[in-house]
Amino acid sequence: MARRNRVAVALVLLSVTVLLCGCSKERMCRVPVGDATCQIEPDSPLYPGLNSTSGYEYLYGGYQGIVVIRTGWRDFVAYERTCPHDKGVLRMAPDYGNMVLECPDCGSRFSTFAEGTTVEGSVTSCSLYQYATYFDGRILYISNYETF
């Protein structure tokens, strides 16, 4: 009889766990991310948009491309161009000097100065996927991984 009770308790606990995990009201932010391991020389003529602060360039890589933004003389950020809401391809949008990425499909807008957080639109809790970057003074390394 004790074995039957333990099995019943285990089944009840398993059912409760499945229900609690499956009924979350929060939207999971899973953006597909492709291989983004690359190296560029941001001060070269190949990337004129990165020759000044607040400049940007689109790169191949990742899932639907990468946007690299120069935020300071030696500082860069790199974001996946896939919208967390509907997987549309993001593009830089003019916003009075603010660096904002916009999804043409759902209208969501993301601040590149605030770690890719949502400014407005359909997505309220999902930020852009940010790639790891490292600049050694000449070469900018971009990767899905934290180590270089």
Regions found by a protein language model. Give the residues of each.
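Bacterial N-terminal signal peptides that target proteins for export
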Residues: 1-12
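Conserved nucleotide-sugar donor-binding subdomain of glycosyltransferases
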Residues: 15
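C-terminal motif of bacterial Sec signal peptides marking the signal peptidase cleavage site
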Residues: 18-22
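N-terminal pre-ligand scaffold of iron-sulfur
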Residues: 24-97, 111-115, 129-148
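Short cysteine/histidine-rich metal-coordination sites, predominantly Zn2+-binding motifs
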Residues: 97-107, 117-132
